[in-house]
From Swiss-Prot:
The gene is matK. GO terms for cellular component: chloroplast. Its main location: plastid. Coiled coil: none annotated. Usually encoded in the trnK tRNA gene intron. Probably assists in splicing its own and other chloroplast group II introns. Pfam families: Intron_maturas2, MatK_N. GO terms for biological process: mRNA processing; RNA splicing; tRNA processing. Keywords: Chloroplast, mRNA processing, Plastid, RNA-binding, tRNA processing. This is Maturase K. It is found in: Plastid, Chloroplast. HAMAP family: MatK. Belongs to the intron maturase 2 family. MatK subfamily. GO terms for molecular function: RNA binding.
């Protein structure tokens, strides 16, 4: 990291013009490798995340030598024809270069972010990076709104548009040419920006960080004008969050847009005045909610479609944006089924000798666990069948008993940790039951005995260790309600340390 800082200090005024030489620096690939290790999931192996023990400085040096010999443009072609290189998978070179790309391409944005906060007091916003931080916002805002726009974020007609947008931020022509070559090589860019991306292991495992950066940059471009319009029409102060990559240097983008679009949009801002408009994005979708009328939502819908198609050349269709009444739908996002439903209550009011009973209905946000998709994920991972019946895990029978229990325990704790905000815990208990019995059947299969006899011989306490830990943590956090396990099971808990959805929860 010190070498990278010294390189950038050589010419701070032109750091954007000298990104290409960084591809020949070994420490860049070491940084990418370290990033992959720190972002791994506790119960997923490094091989699943494609940051395994096969990484070595020798492979990096061989790669750099081949690039010095002007062969970097044919590395991917040759590498795709060879099944392995020194015992590695056939996509090793392309994976390593894309990881280096991901580190280098973030440098200009990181430098602007640091410079924008020089001399300013930066507030700690680490909690904003948590996925669960979205739900308290929904609990506070959504219950007062009427309509919602479900938007499937459009993607560029051609990936050349992404390169053209990056030219405004990166001036290195050689680096951009090589970037263009990468995008031509991975021509199925569209599959990454849709929900089918989950089936494409190339993007998810081998080039995760590189394409995630490009996707965030693409979304940032599509959102920039919308946020600018909202600020101009509502006269509200916008704040940037350093926890999200696409929010980087938002103020600088606004200053640029003020000059370009001041005259064009001044006459139409009055069409969209709505002080109760809220917007948030998750995965490949976004949601706009409002307290306004359906007519106002239709204006936003067709305005966004025309803006994306005419200005950004994004492929979009009106049927990709759905207008719904908030009280009549379930929002399926971030692994939860969320809905706003009236919560009736009876209030007894007594004035002198007269008593009145008043029925009050207050909207409440309900967050449910989607049982069918989650059981489908468990069935895909071979923990149960499609009907939800627990089955053994034959692939794990070669491990020690303690390792098997530990792996099941970590999965169970991760699921409980993520779905601790559910309004109804019965579905979560069913998932725990599936994992508990699957663990017992795996151990019984290993020892060639039945589940009943195995549990009778060893007792059921050996399985309770990883199933009770979550309740112990909640009792420590909320000591006032720890005495009542029934009340504890009804409490919704949102954690601020969840920064990603793992494969089991990516619904």
């Amino acid at each position: 990291m010190e070498e990278l800082q010294r390189y950038l200090k050589m010419d701070r005024s032109r750091e954007r013009d000298f990104l290409y030489p960084l591809l020949f620096q070994e420490y860049i690939y070491a940084l990418a490798h370290d990033f992959g290790l720190t972002k791994s999931i506790p119960y997923e192996s490094m091989q699943i995340l494609s940051y395994d023990n096969k990484y070595s400085s020798l492979i990096v040096k061989r790669l750099i030598i081949r690039m010095y010999q002007q062969k970097h443009l044919i590395i991917l072609d040759n590498d795709s024809k060879n099944k392995n290189f020194l015992g590695h998978n056939k996509n090793l070179y392309s994976q390593m270069i894309s990881e280096g790309f991901a580190v280098i391409v973030e440098i200009p944005f990181a430098l602007r972010l640091v410079s924008s906060y020089q001399g300013k007091e930066i507030e700690k916003s680490i909690n904003l990076g948590s996925i669960h931080s979205t739900f308290p916002f929904l609990e506070d805002k959504f219950v007062h709104l009427n309509h919602v726009l479900n938007i499937l974020i459009p993607y560029p007609i051609h990936f050349e548009l992404i390169v053209q947008n990056l030219r405004c931020w990166i001036q290195d022509a050689s680096f951009l040419h090589l970037l263009r070559f990468f995008l031509y090589e991975y021509h199925n860019w569209n599959s990454f920006t849709t929900q089918k991306m989950k089936q494409n292991s190339l993007f998810l495992k081998e080039n995760r960080r590189f394409f995630l950066f490009l996707y965030n940059f693409h979304v940032y471009e599509s959102e920039s004008i919308f946020l600018f319009l909202r600020k101009k029409s509502y006269h509200l102060r916008s704040t940037s969050s350093i926890a999200f990559l696409d929010r980087t240097h938002f103020f600088g983008k606004i200053e640029h847009l003020k000059v370009v679009f001041r005259n064009d949009f001044h006459t139409m801002l009055w069409l969209f005045k709505d002080p109760f408009m809220h917007y948030f994005r998750y995965q490949g979708k976004s949601i706009m909610s409002s307290k306004g009328t359906p007519l106002l939502m239709k204006k936003w819908k067709y305005y966004l479609v025309n803006l994306w198609e005419c200005h950004f050349y994004f492929w979009s269709q009106p049927n990709r944006i759905h207008i719904n009444q908030l009280s009549n739908i379930f929002l399926n996002f971030l692994g939860y089924l969320s809905s706003v439903r009236p919560n009736p209550s009876v209030v007894r009011n007594q004035m002198l000798e007269n008593a009145f009973i008043i029925d009050i209905s207050i909207n409440k946000l309900n967050t449910l666990v989607p049982i069918i998709p989650l059981i489908g994920s468990l069935a895909k991972a071979k923990f149960c069948n499609l009907s939800g019946q627990p089955i053994s895990k034959p692939a794990w029978t070669d491990s020690l008993d303690s390792d098997i229990i530990d792996r099941f325990g970590r999965i169970c704790r991760n699921v409980s940790h993520y779905y601790s905000g559910s309004s109804k815990k019965k579905t979560l208990y069913r998932i725990k039951y599936i994992l508990r019995l699957s663990c017992a059947r795996t151990l019984a299969r290993k020892h060639k005995s039945s589940v009943r006899s195995f549990l009778k011989r060893l007792g059921s306490e050996f399985l309770e260790e990883f199933l009770i830990e979550e309740e112990q943590v909640l009792s420590f956090i909320l000591p006032k309600i720890s005495s009542s396990s029934q009340r504890l099971s009804k409490e919704r808990i949102w954690y601020f340390d969840i920064i990603r959805i793992n494969d089991l929860m990516d619904l």
